[in-house]
């Protein structure tokens, strides 16, 4: 089984295209993680999209445990054909082995820890925390392979790279964070115009740097010089 975590805010942009080749001929479970940060109507729409492709789908909030209780049952259901084949061969109670994959900072380790009910995998609010593969035994029925998050070498669409930067899947060291903040302000102003005034008490402006300065001033982040 391949368990693929995607960010519910950008489900397509947060999918490594190489995973489809990796998961060929294997049962697939897509987790719309951080579903609490996306709108319900879009979570439902994307769940239907992946189901139409033949994947099992669960909307989860790994940090708060939302949707986690249903996962082990979904895993067993997704692997029922293999479990039945094993049973006919006289192999009983063999644990399901599942690979957990996804891009950096999508929440794989947080998901594994939530599912296990204890800290099994190292977590952090930045990309690249998991450095190597490790098997984690949840119980007698399920074993998970935690894998490092990997981005693909080249983005065909520049907008994909921008979205990944917005959600923290790229290291700040390789980004111009001021330009990135301005791009995010432009995006929010276009598609979610109420967010910035509600969150940061700022007035809309066509120049994103004016808004950025307002936010910095309101948060006492402006230095003299």
Q: What name fits each language-model region?
A:
Residues 6-9, 35, 115, 148:
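Anionic group-transfer/hydrolysis microenvironments
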Residues 7, 50, 111, 146-147:
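Residue-level signature of catalytic and energy-coupling elements of molecular machines
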Residues 62, 112, 142-145:
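Conserved active-site beta-strand-loop modules that form the wall/rim of enzyme catalytic pockets
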Residues 1, 8-28, 41, 56, ...:
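Helix-rich effector regions associated with P-loop NTPase G domains
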Residues 27-29, 35-102, 120:
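Canonical P-loop GTPase G-domain recognition
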Residues 97-117, 121, 147:
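Glycine-rich phosphate-binding P-loop
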């Amino acid at each position: 089984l391949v368990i693929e975590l995607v960010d519910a805010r950008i489900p397509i942009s947060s999918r490594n295209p190489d995973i489809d080749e990796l998961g060929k001929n294997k049962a697939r479970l897509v987790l719309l993680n951080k579903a609490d940060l996306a709108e319900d109507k879009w979570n439902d729409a994307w769940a239907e999209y992946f189901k139409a492709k033949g994947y099992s789908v669960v909307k989860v909030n790994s940090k708060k445990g939302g949707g986690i209780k249903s996962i082990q049952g979904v895993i067993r259901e997704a692997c029922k054909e293999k479990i039945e084949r094993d049973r006919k061969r006289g192999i009983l109670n063999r644990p399901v082995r599942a690979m957990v994959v996804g891009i950096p900072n999508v929440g794989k380790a947080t998901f594994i820890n939530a599912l296990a009910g204890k800290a099994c995998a190292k977590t952090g609010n930045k990309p690249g925390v998991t450095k190597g593969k490790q098997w984690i035994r949840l119980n007698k029925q399920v074993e998970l392979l935690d894998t490092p998050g990997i981005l693909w070498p080249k983005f065909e669409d520049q907008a994909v790279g921008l979205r990944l930067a917005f959600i923290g899947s790229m290291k700040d060291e390789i980004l111009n964070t001021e330009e990135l903040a301005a791009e995010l302000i432009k995006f929010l102003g276009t598609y979610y115009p109420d967010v910035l005034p509600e969150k940061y008490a700022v007035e809309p402006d066509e120049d994103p740097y004016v808004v950025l300065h307002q936010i910095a001033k309101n948060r006492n982040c402006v230095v003299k010089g």
